């Protein structure tokens, strides 16, 4: 069974500055961690920008930062960070995690949040980083999903794979 880690809550990390969010995105999108058979396993939703923007951590950060400035939000927390880890037995093909990751960020994007993913395959246990903006781009309200609600929806997506 995949493990869902709620990084903010489990490790008491806030991503209190824009630079913290930018550093997180750059770490997650690192090509040495996300490259698989010539493809980068990263992305962002909901925007329909060209792929080179959606796979660039600095561009993704600019989308999120613009959203914060629209609401005059200059103090964090700025993002929710989730990590979904798989054992070697659970994940035989790294490329299959891309569609799982896209479905997970669609869950957040469909509810009005900019969300990004990065699949890391450079470790024994493959894992997906999910980074979600704290402000809704639709109505500028703060992130308000309970842990149970997120967990049950992510698990439902994982059970479909």
Where do the model's predicted regions map?
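N-terminal nicking endonuclease/strand-transfer module with a His-rich metal-binding environment
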Residues: 1-161
């Amino acid at each position: 069974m995949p493990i869902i880690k709620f990084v903010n809550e489990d490790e008491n990390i806030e991503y209190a500055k824009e630079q913290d969010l930018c550093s997180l995105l750059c770490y997650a999108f690192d090509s040495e961690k996300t490259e698989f058979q010539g493809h980068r396993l990263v992305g962002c939703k909901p925007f329909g920008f060209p792929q080179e923007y959606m796979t660039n951590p600095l561009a993704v950060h600019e989308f999120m930062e613009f959203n914060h400035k629209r609401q005059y939000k200059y103090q964090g927390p700025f993002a929710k960070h989730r990590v979904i880890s798989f054992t070697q037995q659970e994940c035989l093909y790294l490329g299959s995690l891309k569609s799982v990751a896209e479905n997970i960020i669609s869950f957040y994007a469909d509810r009005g949040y900019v969300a990004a993913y990065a699949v890391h395959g450079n470790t024994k246990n493959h894992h997906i980083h999910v980074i979600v903006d704290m402000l809704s781009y639709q109505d500028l309200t703060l992130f308000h999903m309970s842990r149970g609600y997120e967990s049950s929806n992510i698990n439902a997506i994982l059970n479909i794979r």
